[in-house]
Structure formats: C-alpha cells, structure tokens
Amino acid sequence: MQYPLPIARLIDNYMKLPGIGEKTATRLAFYTMDMPEDDVEDFSKSLIQVKENLHSCSICGNITESDPCEICRDANRDRSTIMVVEQPKDVMAFEEMGEYNGLYHVLHGVLSPMDGVGPEEINIKSLITRLQKQDEVKEVILALNSSPEGEATAMYLAKLIKPAGLKVTRLAAGLAVGSDIEYANSITLKRAVQGRTDL
C-alpha cells in the first residue's frame, strides 16, 4: 500500500536531510501529522524564515540577519586574530565555549578534489582579500576538522597566508583521554606530538 501523496511528499522531504533514512523520515512525517496545527505552522514558518532572513556576512561569511554580522561589527573583538572554520556551526561552537574573542572567517566547506570542490568553490578568495586589507591581523588560526580534506585545506591556506608574514597556527589536537595509542590514526598522533606541552 502506498502512502497518501501529502505524506509521501513529506517523507521525501525529510529524507533530503542529512542522516535521515526512509524509516526515520516516515516516523517524522507521521509525528508531524499528529502535531497540533499551530506547531506545524510555527515549524513551517521557521523553515521559511531561515531561508528568507539569513544570509552570509559580506566580511566573514558567517550566517547573519544583518550585514556585517554581529561579530564583525563588535568593536570589543580582538581584530588581530582571525579563526578560519569550515561551517557557521563551528563559529557557534567556539562562541559557546567563550574562550575566543577574535574574529572568524567561514569557508563553507573544505577542499575536496574528488567531490569537485576546489579553491573557487569555497570562501578562500575573500579570506585572502580580507587579509590584504586588514593590517591589524597578526595571526590566522586554522580551526578545520582533522579529516584528510580539512588537513589538505589547512596546508593549502598556510601556503597562501605565510608569505604575507602572518602567524599561521593550527588548533592543538591529540589523543582523547583513555584512548590507546595503537588505535589512533596517524593524523591524531602527529597532532598530539606537535601540540605537546612541557610538564
């Protein structure tokens, strides 16, 4: 038996979300159908508002309702440091941490030649232009994931940025507490050694 068309469409739409398979999408569709109408309206409005009201900051590429974004406008931020991240959600994670008070630059991805993602497809050109215009920047922190693509992107960016005389750093990363060295991958071990501190 096939589902009625409205449910089938809703299932198909839920399946467009990352990590949502057919079973989960079906569960969500039926849950949505059982929700109060006001909640469904709020849900649909929030989806539309995200698409209509959010855009990328013209300076850093973070998501924002106003341009430039709140972080770029904040005169109390440390303008000598720019942290380069992959996605807007990474900015949110660092902001929640509350330890970093510099600026950001969001790439909206990483280099991945296998997927057809080169330097032109992510927000690299605007980073280089920004670094050329903003004399107060002294350090660029590459806060990219430890995936092969993240590592390749970090190396590529370092080669572009270092000739300008800026300090380029990478987040220290290493072994998780309680993990066995023999099961750690080479990138984790390399970063653990490079990020070591004196005792």
From Swiss-Prot:
Domain of life: Bacteria
Coiled coil: none
Keyword DNA damage: yes
UniProt entry keywords in alphabetical sequence: DNA damage, DNA recombination, DNA repair, Metal-binding, Zinc, Zinc-finger
InterPro entries from the UniProt entry: DNA_Rcmb_RecR (IPR000093), Rcmb_RecR (IPR023627), Rcmb_RecR_Znf (IPR015967), TOPRIM_dom (IPR006171), TOPRIM_RecR (IPR034137)
Organism (species): Lactobacillus gasseri (strain ATCC 33323 / DSM 20243 / BCRC 14619 / CIP 102991 / JCM 1131 / KCTC 3163 / NCIMB 11718 / NCTC 13722 / AM63)
CDD domains found in the cross-reference section: TOPRIM_recR
Keyword Heme: no
Annotated family: Belongs to the RecR family.
Protein function: May play a role in DNA repair. It seems to be involved in an RecBC-independent recombinational process of DNA repair. It may act with RecF and RecO.
Name by which UniProt lists this protein: Recombination protein RecR
Zinc finger region(s), C4-type: 57-72
GO molecular function, one term: DNA binding
PROSITE patterns, per the entry: RECR (PS01300), TOPRIM (PS50880)
Biological-process GO terms, alphabetical: DNA recombination; DNA repair
SUPFAM superfamilies: Recombination protein RecR (SSF111304)
Upper lineage: Bacteria, Bacillati, Bacillota, Bacilli, Lactobacillales
SMART domains tied to this protein: TOPRIM
